[in-house]
Amino acid sequence: SLMATYSSGGGTQKYLPFAPRGVWTFSPLGYMIGGLPTRYSFDLFLAPGRVLRIERIDWRPVPVAPAERTEHERIVTYMMRRVDPAWRWTGPGIPDVKPPYTNLFVGESRRIWVLLHQEAQQNAPDLEDTDEAGADPQLTWTEPVAFDVFEPDGRYLGMVRAPKGFSTRPSPVIRGDTVWAVVHGALDVPFVNRFVIRRD
């Protein structure tokens, strides 16, 4: 993580973009699921002494695009210098590749949905926000939302790609092949939408 301190004491801490962070959630079956995505694996803590590890050995790392890296460095530096105007980036650099996943969700049918890191796409910035004096820099490189889905016994079911605007915050509600999630429309107005998975 990266740190900046106020001259009067105290400070702020930012996670290093794309550095692996531990992820944890709970299954409706009563056990914890978690992992540290330094590789594509996570564990189901079924009972004391019983752990099921799910791993994809065919996973290929997603690279961080040079312009994407530059944007994250610029935004982090801006936020840190709001705390300490003399702040300089002296910690570890942004990794060259992204972790395999960034979050875990469990549906009501007990299936495990792994939120994947994807290649980012650059969106046009909001000109109204960028023209505003003192406006915070915008994140224009964003990743499409995609999940790998597993049965609780570890069987891989496939990848699910979500439509544009799909948000994973708050956590989507998943029941079988139906998903309820917050979607942000053209004016960035949030609303709840229901999706049904289409199988190819």
Over which residues does each language-model region extend?
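Eukaryotic scaffold repeat domains enriched in small/polar residues
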Residues: S1-D200
